[in-house]
């Protein structure tokens, strides 16, 4: 099923994955959860703004999750827009919209891609269990559509550690570059 699903969407030239990663096992975080959520939103919004053509417009649509988490994410996004950022979000809707994944192929795609990335990272960082299926799907469907620098670098472009941490980045670089 997953391969059939991905085969239908991977031919879209605009398909691009950006993952923000927090390594909760090795990265102590002294920030409140709402601040970490804001960092995740900020990383994604900055990259979306950078990649949007001057005459283009982007909207972030995410899974409904649970109502408390959605409220936290929307509040984080609102604070990011109100408090400002070094990037001016001229081509990105200043909020997030939610949709039920069972009613949206785009949200299903994001859900599957996140699950695949989770399996790929678990295999390489935790070495528990058999993640062959996830790593095969990662190589076949996610890797070709990861946001990259012109020189092919993925970490820092399509995969961002949140909060920024050079030691985590050093762990991620061999997995993606």
Where do the model's predicted regions map?
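Phosphate-ester processing/binding pockets and catalytic centers
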Residues: 1-177
């Amino acid at each position: 099923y997953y391969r059939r699903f991905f085969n239908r969407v991977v031919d879209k030239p605009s398909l691009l994955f950006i993952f923000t990663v927090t390594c909760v096992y090795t990265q102590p975080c002294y920030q409140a959860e709402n601040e970490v959520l804001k960092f995740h939103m900020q990383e994604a919004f900055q990259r979306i703004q950078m990649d949007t053509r001057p005459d283009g417009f982007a909207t972030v649509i995410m899974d409904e999750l649970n109502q408390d988490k959605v409220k936290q994410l929307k509040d984080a996004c609102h604070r990011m827009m109100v408090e400002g950022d070094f990037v001016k979000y001229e081509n990105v809707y200043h909020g997030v919209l939610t949709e039920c994944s069972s009613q949206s192929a785009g949200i299903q795609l994001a859900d599957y891609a996140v699950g695949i990335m989770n399996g790929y990272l678990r295999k390489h960082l935790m070495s528990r269990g058999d993640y062959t299926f996830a790593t095969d799907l990662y190589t076949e469907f996610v890797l070709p559509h990861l946001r990259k620098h012109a020189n092919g670098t993925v970490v820092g472009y399509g995969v961002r550690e949140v909060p920024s941490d050079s030691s985590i980045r050093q762990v991620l670089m061999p997995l993606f570059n």
